[in-house]
């Protein structure tokens, strides 16, 4: 019967999730948009609060080829008289959110950035994520005391099983895995490393992912490899792009061989980053 409904896999999965939440009588359900917001299946939800973290170039084929167009689509989750928390800081985009929030009579909040919280997720972008989460807690007036907030932030991986966010696999040299898979995430991650770092990179075969190479610092060394997926970007395509933009690069047939060479080329005080796709993680987790 499901086949006759004409629903997508995501729509069916979302409906099942909502039913499950209802049967379990959860206090709060955190529902993440699949694509954009305005036309997403999840936008049927009547929320107590809406959250927009940041605006990147993900899925611009569907959402629009400018940040303003993408922001407009994401602002589609702002509901009438429902508060919204916005992590995005660029003034040009803030104007879009302010305009739509005013039209919907929705209170809008741009969180203050906190740097004094510790978390077991140690990526350079976690301060922003934590600040957004704290603002949501405040807006909902949840009875969570400071002690429990501090404790929860130190146990995110334990409580959620979330891995692959600035995950330190080994030391001397420092081996890091970070599943940065879009231009904005990669830029933040790479800017956190010192010159001369070795970057093992593999990704899916998507135009935006290949374009990511354009923001790669020329002061680093790149080890390109395929990912464990039928949709992997070919190493030849990555290397051709790297050659055009004058990166220092090497090509490999597997993540294992790329990583082995990166290790061989690194001194004990240097960094090795494996990034580009979550599909790489299953290969290197065995090294723990």
Task: Name each model feature, range by range.
Residues 20, 38, 93-96, 185-188, ...:
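Phosphate- and divalent-cation-binding pockets in alpha/beta enzyme and binding domains
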Residues 35-39, 46-105:
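Conserved catalytic-core segment of NTP-binding enzymes
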Residues 7, 25-27, 194, 267-270:
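Short, high-confidence coil segments that cap the C-terminus of an alpha-helix
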Residues 1-45, 63:
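ATP-dependent carboxylate-amine ligase catalytic core
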Residues 277:
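Active-site-proximal loop/hinge segments that shape catalytic or ion-binding/gating pockets
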Residues 76-84, 193-197, 218-221, 268:
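Short, surface-exposed connector motifs at secondary-structure boundaries
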Residues 89-109, 174-177, 210-271:
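C-terminal helical cap/extension that packs against the catalytic core
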Residues 23-33, 41-51, 56-59, 69, ...:
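Nucleotide phosphate-binding/pyrophosphate-handling subdomain across enzymes
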């Amino acid at each position: 019967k499901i086949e006759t409904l004409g629903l997508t896999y995501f729509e069916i999965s979302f409906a099942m999730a909502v039913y499950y939440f209802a049967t379990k009588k959860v206090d709060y359900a955190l529902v993440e948009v699949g694509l954009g917001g305005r036309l997403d299946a999840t936008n049927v939800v009547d929320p107590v609060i809406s959250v927009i973290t940041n605006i990147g170039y993900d899925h611009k084929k569907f959402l629009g080829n400018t940040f303003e167009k993408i922001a407009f689509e994401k602002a589609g989750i702002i509901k009438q008289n429902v508060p919204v928390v916005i992590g995005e800081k660029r003034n040009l985009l803030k104007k879009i959110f302010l305009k739509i929030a005013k039209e919907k009579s929705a209170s809008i909040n741009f969180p203050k950035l906190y740097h004094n919280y510790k978390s077991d997720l140690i990526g350079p972008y976690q301060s922003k994520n934590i600040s957004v989460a704290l603002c949501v807690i405040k807006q909902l007036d949840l009875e969570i005391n400071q002690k429990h907030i501090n404790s929860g932030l130190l146990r995110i991986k334990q409580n959620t099983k979330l891995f692959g966010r600035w995950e330190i696999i080994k030391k001397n040299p420092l081996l890091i895995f970070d599943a940065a898979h879009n231009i904005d995430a990669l830029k933040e991650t790479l800017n956190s490393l010192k010159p001369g770092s070795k970057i093992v990179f593999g990704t899916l075969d998507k135009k935006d992912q290949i374009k990511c190479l354009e923001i790669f610092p020329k002061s680093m060394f790149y080890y390109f490899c395929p990912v464990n997926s039928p949709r992997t970007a070919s190493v030849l395509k990555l290397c051709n792009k790297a050659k055009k933009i004058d990166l220092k690069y090497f090509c490999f047939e597997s993540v294992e061989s790329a990583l082995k060479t990166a290790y061989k080329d690194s001194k004990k005080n240097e960094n090795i980053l494996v990034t580009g796709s979550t599909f790489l993680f299953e290969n290197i987790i065995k090294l723990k």
